[in-house]
C-alpha cells in the first residue's frame, strides 16, 4: 500500500522569457529541484486563472511584469527526492508552459523568501552544461526549435 503522506501532486505554471540569446531562470532553494535552475513560475492558487498565477509568480521571483503570454504546452515529470528533513518524497509534477514577453530594466537577483535563490539570464548556448530541472529543459529546447 502506498504512503500518500509522502506523495505530492503539483500543478504549476511557468514562463519562458528569452532576451538577447539568453533565457531567464531561477535557482531553486528547496524541493525536488533544489540546487538546480528552473523556469520562473509556480503553483496556482484556488480561483486563480493560470495567466494570473504566472504574472504573480513572475513578479515574486524575478520582479518582472509580463506583458504577453502564449501557451505552448505542458510537461509531466515523476521523481523521488529528499525533503529538508531528509525524508523520502515522491513528486508527480505537471507543468503548464507559456512563452512570455516583458519590458524590464532589471531582474531580482536575490531570494524571494519561498523557493528561489534569485533569477538570472543564462546563455542558451550553455544550457546543456547547466544543472536545469528535468521538467523545464525539454520545454525550453522545444521552444528554441520552433
Outline where the language-model segments fall.
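A short coil-to-beta-strand element that immediately follows conserved catalytic motifs
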Residues: 65-74
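Conserved Nudix-box catalytic region and its N-terminal flanking loop in Nudix hydrolases
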Residues: 22-61
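Conserved hydrophobic "DFG−1" position in protein kinase catalytic cores
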Residues: 17-18, 25, 100
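Short connector loops at helix/strand junctions that flank enzyme active sites
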Residues: 10, 18, 34, 39, ...
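Short aromatic/basic micro-patch
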Residues: 38, 65, 121
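Active-site-adjacent beta-strand/loop module that shapes the phosphate/pyrophosphate-binding cleft
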Residues: 75-107
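Acidic, metal-coordinating catalytic segment for phosphate/diphosphate chemistry
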Residues: 1-16, 20, 88
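NUDIX/MutT-family hydrolases
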Residues: 99-101, 109-140
Amino acid at each position: 500500500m502506498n504512503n500518500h503522506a509522502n506523495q505530492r501532486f503539483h500543478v504549476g505554471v511557468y514562463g519562458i522569457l528569452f532576451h538577447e540569446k539568453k533565457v531567464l531562470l531561477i535557482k531553486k532553494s528547496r524541493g525536488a529541484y533544489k540546487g538546480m535552475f528552473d523556469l520562473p513560475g509556480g503553483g496556482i492558487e484556488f480561483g486563480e486563472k493560470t495567466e494570473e498565477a504566472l504574472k504573480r509568480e513572475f513578479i515574486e521571483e524575478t520582479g518582472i511584469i509580463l506583458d504577453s503570454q502564449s501557451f505552448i504546452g505542458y510537461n509531466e515529470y515523476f521523481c523521488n527526492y529528499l525533503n529538508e528533513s531528509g525524508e523520502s518524497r515522491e513528486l508527480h509534477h505537471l507543468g503548464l508552459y507559456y512563452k512570455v514577453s516583458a519590458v524590464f530594466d532589471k531582474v531580482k537577483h536575490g531570494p524571494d523568501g519561498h523557493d528561489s535563490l534569485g533569477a538570472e539570464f543564462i546563455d542558451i548556448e550553455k544550457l546543456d552544461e547547466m544543472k536545469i530541472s528535468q521538467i523545464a529543459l525539454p520545454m525550453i529546447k522545444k521552444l528554441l526549435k520552433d
